[in-house]
Amino acid sequence: MPNLSRLGDTNQAGGAIMRGAPTVIANGIKVGLHVSQITPHGPGPHDAAVTTSASPTVFAEGVAVLRITSGNSCGHSIVEGSPDIFVP
């Protein structure tokens, strides 16, 4: 199972998750939520990327949570996450 991703966790190019659940915390950090913007990490599609996939079964505040392997609209995927929380 992939690790849960959180606000500030990054994709392989360094773009970071910008949307976190205000009331759901993992390892002291807000849980990353689907359809999050990703910080700009290059030109073209990398300057306005959003997440395109998330856990199909785990939700926070009614929104699917992000995890390592969650895709981004620029073609990258999330590569950072919680060291000890895993989600399907």
Write out the residue ranges for each language-model feature.
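Intrinsically disordered, low-complexity proline/glycine-rich segments
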Residues: 2-88
